[in-house]
Amino acid sequence: MTESTFKSGFVAIIGRPNVGKSTLLNRIVGEKIAIMSDKAQTTRNKIQGIYTTDDAQVVFIDTPGVHKPQNSLGDFMVKSAFSALHEADAIWFVVDASMARGRGDDFIIDRLQEVKNTPIYLLINKVDLLAPNDLLDVIASYQNDAPEWAEVFPISATEGDNVPELLDNIVSHLDEGPQYFDADQLTDHPERFVIGELIREKVLQLTRQEVPHSVAVVIDKIARENEEKIHIQASIIVERPTQKNIIIGKQGAMIKDIGTRARKDIERLLGDKVFLETWVKVEPRWRDRPQALQTLGYRQEDY
């Protein structure tokens, strides 16, 4: 292989909340870089996952699920999602095969129809939950009042069904280009960001109601104490004292469970033993305060 035959490009992944975008990205790169949860709006930043082979590199942008904004953070998330469309060489629009086409899908489709000269793929995800005879009806429901799809792929991000074929297809359509990142690099986000997201994932998995959406995580310190252990200090940010009490739990049981689960994932990520300390802090209405959003890493100029 010569450098002139190397292919590369950027692919934006967009869709409603909870259709499996982050699961698909993690399936492709083979590591957990985007957090997953049954809560809507899990992804808040555009996560760039990097897939590299001997002759190609695809940089994937996993956008926040598009929803009606309820606060400044929500507005940031939606703007972040649509800005990715203008950066991409191709777009993957992911829908949930187990759910009927809805207003959220139509809202995204309207924006996709404004995109010119960029191939748009329709990915029908979660086909493992669908009766085989129903697949054609699902595909047909996305043919009217929609862009002309470059390709339609039924997939299961969870099981991996048809994902290798999808990757082969997108690589075949890329133009020749440079290798933007080292072959062993899986994301362009710094280590602190990914660690913080792994902690936030555990909060999302273990709490309910308004608590998951009110949480941010700040990594205060990462220090290697010796050759075998990494010391991490993290602050879990909430908006109200009642939320702080929920996350701490009775006699500290909840915060201990969050820390234990997060530590295991962080150790797998870093390949070393981790000593994780977590604190819970109250920042009133941080989701509606632009300065607080910037401090916590949601910076519009980055997107």
Curated annotation (Swiss-Prot):
Region of interest: G4: 125-128
Record lineage: Bacteria, Bacillati, Bacillota, Bacilli, Lactobacillales
A single MF term (Gene Ontology): GTPase activity
HAMAP family: GTPase_Era
Annotated region (G3), positions in chain: 62-65
Keyword Nucleotide-binding on entry: yes
Domain of life: Bacteria
Region of interest: G1: 15-22
Span list, region G5: 155-157
GO CC, one annotated term: cytosol
Pfam families: KH_2, MMR_HSR1
Keyword Zinc-finger: no
Coiled-coil features, chain-numbered ranges: none
Protein name as it appears in the record: GTPase Era
Function: An essential GTPase that binds both GDP and GTP, with rapid nucleotide exchange. Plays a role in 16S rRNA processing and 30S ribosomal subunit biogenesis and possibly also in cell cycle regulation and energy metabolism.
Region described as G2: 41-45
Keywords from the named record: Cell membrane, Cytoplasm, GTP-binding, Membrane, Nucleotide-binding, Ribosome biogenesis, RNA-binding, rRNA-binding
Family: Belongs to the TRAFAC class TrmE-Era-EngA-EngB-Septin-like GTPase superfamily. Era GTPase family.
Binding site for GTP: 15-22, 62-66, 125-128
Record membrane topology: Peripheral membrane protein
Domain Era-type G span(s) in chain numbering: 7-176
KH type-2 domain segment(s): 207-284
